[in-house]
Each structure stands twice: as structure tokens, then as C-alpha cells.
From Swiss-Prot:
<protein>
    <recommendedName>
        <fullName>Quinoline 2-oxidoreductase alpha chain</fullName>
        <ecNumber>1.3.99.17</ecNumber>
    </recommendedName>
</protein>
<comment type="function">
    <text>Converts (3-methyl-)-quinoline to (3-methyl-)2-oxo-1,2-dihydroquinoline.</text>
</comment>
<comment type="subunit">
    <text>Heterohexamer of two alpha chains, two beta chains, and two gamma chains.</text>
</comment>
<comment type="pathway">
    <text>Xenobiotic degradation; quinoline degradation.</text>
</comment>
<dbReference type="GO" id="GO:0018523">
    <property type="term" value="F:quinoline 2-oxidoreductase activity"/>
</dbReference>
<keyword id="KW-0500">Molybdenum</keyword>
<keyword id="KW-0560">Oxidoreductase</keyword>
Amino acid sequence: AKSDVAELKPR
């Protein structure tokens, strides 16, 4: 996704 980081993080 565009924000893979967001998906990896709890928030």
C-alpha cells in the first residue's frame, strides 16, 4: 500500500 509503514505500526 502507499503507507505500508502505517500498516506495520499499531497506529
